[in-house]
Amino acid sequence: MLPLVALVGRPNVGKSTLFNALTLTRDALVHDQPGVTRDRHYGVCRIDGQPLFAVVDTGGMVGKEDGLAGATARQARLAAAEADVVLFVVNVREGASALDDDILAWLRKLSQPTLLVINKIDGVSDTTVHSEFAHYGFSDVVPVSAAHRQGLDDLIEQVLAWLPERSIGEALNEDSERIHIAFVGRPNVGKSTLVNRLLGEERMIVSDVPGTTRDSITVDLERDEFRYRLVDTAGLRRKSKVEEAVEKFSAFKTLQAIEQCQVAVLLLDAGEGVTDQDATVLAAILDAGKALVVAMNKWDGLATYQREQAEDLLSRKLGFVNWAEVVRLSAKHGSGLRELFRAIHRAHVSALRQFSTSEVNKALEIAYQTAPPPSIRGYVSKLRYVHPAGSNPPTFIVHGTRLKVLPDTYKRYLENFFRKRFKLVGTPVRFLFREGDNPYEGKKNVLSERQIQRRRRLMRHVKRK
């Protein structure tokens, strides 16, 4: 399970700015006006694409009139209760307030591990930063400027030190022989019906009412001598549509399931086509870098012309993930399930494939010779060498010079070239580009005395000519 870190504090102390800085997104609204964030929402803190922990942003707790019993405060209380670590965020420019004192007293009753994060330290003396909140008695205090990304490395390091010793890798290794599959999609597309069909029993509650599944449910399956771990998740909606507190927690559990799976099956309603909500779910899968299979459910109920329309809409809206296989099936009647498992296996094998340094360098050399990078403002990028940097998804680090001007079109060319050469199906491929990291830079072979004498003789010979 991904550990969870909650951001708690009064309004306008910079919680949403800190959330955006930790998750490298702009998901949280940021404004000088207090109270912009009312609900809680979730993101993931990653370094080089590897997830470290989930982050939940909460609304600011306001004065005693609404106080700790208000709706926004209830959201913050729920977030703090489910978190592994709480970050109590304060504003050094405004100093400690009575509301800060009230929130701290509530946090101490909660008995959750808590770090004091002093925000907006830019332009403030160190003496002021450390003295303003000294009376709170925190042993762990992290000064940051979320807006300028100052102190974030120290904050992440402190958070990791406080988190329980568990990770995605450990969760997956609980049964490394099983293929971990998450069935995800918007509400009421048939995820629970599909899992029940695969299991051959009514394990999940099935209803026409969207949102019947409120938690991620994990079950094991053995089929055709293969072992699987299936996760039926709650439907993901756009954030504006997520209202109930329980449903917000369900959305977080779904994001956790995506982070922990090896293959994500995105279930679509063939009759409704690809909707904006489907795009929201797909974005979560792509952000996590997971292998993907697209399943068009309720295919058997479509007429010929409806199927043609569905295919056309799919190619137009999901053309940017044309590397993912599409399976047409009926969860209700069981058609297409064998092809679904075949697609899952192909995606799983591709996502976890191991590469040697020699074979990826050979591929880079051929790609470079076939189509060199274009000249950008008189500069041409040089790709010197590449090495594999991980799997699920396959990741490669390319070293060279002037890589900052390498156009996105050429990066996509490399991705497609590697995908075709190594027959990678159903998995994203990531490239990281590094400049000036030549391992042999600054190193020289020390010449022996004999080599030095030989070089001198050669130089005398050259001079006589």
From Swiss-Prot:
Entry keyword set: GTP-binding, Nucleotide-binding, Repeat, Ribosome biogenesis
Chain positions recorded as GTP 1 binding sites: 9-16, 57-61, 119-122
Keyword Acetylation part of the UniProt annotation: no
HAMAP family, per the entry: GTPase_Der
Reported function: GTPase that plays an essential role in the late steps of ribosome biogenesis.
Protein name in UniProt: GTPase Der
Family in the record: Belongs to the TRAFAC class TrmE-Era-EngA-EngB-Septin-like GTPase superfamily. EngA (Der) GTPase family.
Biological process, per Gene Ontology: ribosome biogenesis
Domain EngA-type G: 3-167, 179-352
Gene Ontology molecular function, alphabetical: ATP hydrolysis activity; GTP binding; ribosome binding
The keyword GTP-binding appears for this protein: yes
The protein's assembly and partners: Associates with the 50S ribosomal subunit.
Residues annotated as binding GTP 2: 185-192, 232-236, 297-300
Domain KH-like residue range list: 353-437
InterPro entries: AAA+_ATPase, G_ENGA, GTP-bd, GTPase_Der, KH_dom-like, KH_dom-like_a/b, P-loop_NTPase, Small_GTP-bd
